[in-house]
Amino acid sequence: MTAPVLIADELLEVRGQVSPVPRVHYLHHEFEVPDGVTRLKVTLRFHKERRCQLFLSVFGPGGYRGTRMNPGAVGDVGLELAFGEGFASLGALPGAVESGTWRAQIDIESTDEVADYLLTVQAITEHLPAAAPTGPAPTNGRPGAGWYRGELHSHTHHSDGKASAATLAGAARRYGLEFLALTDHFTTSGWSEIVNEAGPDLAVIRSLELTGHRGHANLHGLSGWVDPFVDDPDSAWDINAVARAVHAQGGLFGVNHAFSNSLGWRYHEFDWSLCDVFEIYHHLERPNNAAQLTFWDGLLRAGHRVTGVAGTDSHDPHAGRHRLGQVFTVLGAESLTSEGLLGALRIGCAYVSLGPEMAFTAEAGGRTAGMGEELPLPGPVRLHLGLSRLNFPVRVFMMKNGLYHTHLDLPAGGEDVQIDLEDSEPVPGYYRAEVYARPAQSDFFGGREWQNTLLLSNPIYIGGPA
């Protein structure tokens, strides 16, 4: 058999330098691709002594083709994107290499040092065999209403995670998850792989993480890539434009780890009416979870009906605090499908759990409402909270408009517990429930320490007169 003829041409070689001053967010290098190219390889090399985070993205005449990042690396760092028909490297999207003007983008996420870089583009022309036909995608979830627990923040090796999509999905099943959102930074290259790991027992949601210079956000339930590069001061494409584009696809915009220091939320121009989801418990953020919970209450009191969720932010689904299954978002969905789960997230039929289960409803004026729903005034409000799988003595708090309303201490026990409360003086706003483990030795009366969190409900809203 005759070996394929391979011809490689250098289309671009650029040497440059980044430095802390002047502050530049993106560097753009255009190059021309001739007809007949079957594969393209774009490489960025730089040396990092302390902190120099550079990310590589490539855009063709038809749009976005991928992003590569390696934020933890030190020393000599190499980022590579390669693609062609039926072929793509990690972070890249497969497809024909179009002739015309292409663009390589260097995202200077942060740097406190001067660093030299080398950007090269290599065009390869060779005869490629026809791609093997693919079979139908597996069933993504199943019909039937229920309460489903899962993960809304996870990464694979297509961005800065360690695991493949198959390993991530396998871990989700092993640790009892029923749904999984893939939120790789910038890129959608893992979508086709994670969808192939779905089944009747595991629904997957196509998402990505906007990784900006002033904060991160998960874009959930997308049908196509949304441009997450919002830090060009000369561009009208900003964080609010991204949220509107996500909504135009029927997706949800969620703010991540808002108090994570330099990775926290600093888009002060953000219109909070565009926010659908907010991480109130992030498994890696530890004490910052208290600030996130307080900030969320501020949003709720301001009238923003934002759904509170949890995130593991898993980069290695079997290791340490990144291991899946240590914290869940539980959704009361019409079906275990992407559409059903997004519907539950949209209205706030959800709670955060680190193990136990809850059922939370309220009654007023002859009507009953669950989390995310609203009851009218006037009249007393009766609150019903069912708890199960309590393996610790717990303290249960009922919060009213973000402030303490009442609390109850319960012993450990395997039996289900039903708590019924009445508020004879309700006002417009909301109620939500919190459950914390009670340490055997504690000299603090309050009992809302972040490290003892077990359950956080979403609100039941109280409106004006019917």
Residue locations for each model-derived region?
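Solvent-exposed, flexible loop/coil segments flanking beta-strands in beta-rich domains
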Residues: 1-48, 121-129, 134-145
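Surface-exposed beta-strand/loop patches in noncatalytic accessory domains
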Residues: 7-22, 44-89
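Noncatalytic modules at the cell exterior or secretory-pathway interfaces
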Residues: 38-41, 93-114, 427-432
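Exposed aromatic-hydrophobic patches
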Residues: 28-31, 80-81, 91, 415-424
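Histidine-centered catalytic micro-motifs
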Residues: 148-161, 312-314, 433
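Edge beta-strands of jelly-roll/beta-sandwich modules across compartments, strongly enriched
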Residues: 52-54, 112-124
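Charged catalytic cores and adjacent phosphate/nucleic-acid-binding surfaces used
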Residues: 57, 127, 131-143, 212-229, ...
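Catalytic cores of extracellular degradative/oxidative enzymes
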Residues: 156-304, 321
